[in-house]
Swiss-Prot record:
CDD domains: RNase_HI_prokaryote_like. Its main location: cytoplasm. Residues 1-141 form the RNase H type-1 domain. It is an enzyme of class 3 (hydrolase). This is Ribonuclease H. It comes from Solibacter usitatus (strain Ellin6076).
Amino acid sequence: MKKVQLITDGACLGNPGPGGWSAILRFEEQKKELWGCEKQTTNNRMELTAAIEGLRALREKCQVEVVTDSEYVLKGITTWIDGWKRKGWMTAAKKPVINQDLWKLLDEQVNRHQATWTWTKGHASHADNNRCDELATRAAREQSKS
């Protein structure tokens, strides 16, 4: 099974507002950059979309280390999601899970792979995370012009 590193980031101008996401896939010496945007969204939705699209780009089952600077995504996928599913996608406060559509898509993609999750400090020393931030911000800016 291939070992892949997936680095993700999301950006939003306004929150809500125009947003962008990006993902970098690393396999051995290969590197692939992905990015996209939405006209009206939130930062959390873009963080989730980055992880979904990065995982979706993998055509076969892989061992994936997902690197994110989003504590929301990290805690959601590693800590909260099992409880949400048990409770019919309701939070501990008995309210519907925000961004449920994307959490379901992320769960679907994660289950295709052997995934581990790593948090990295944003805007710091992780070169690929900084590149993801640059791509996501650029995508959000381009979306805001259209």
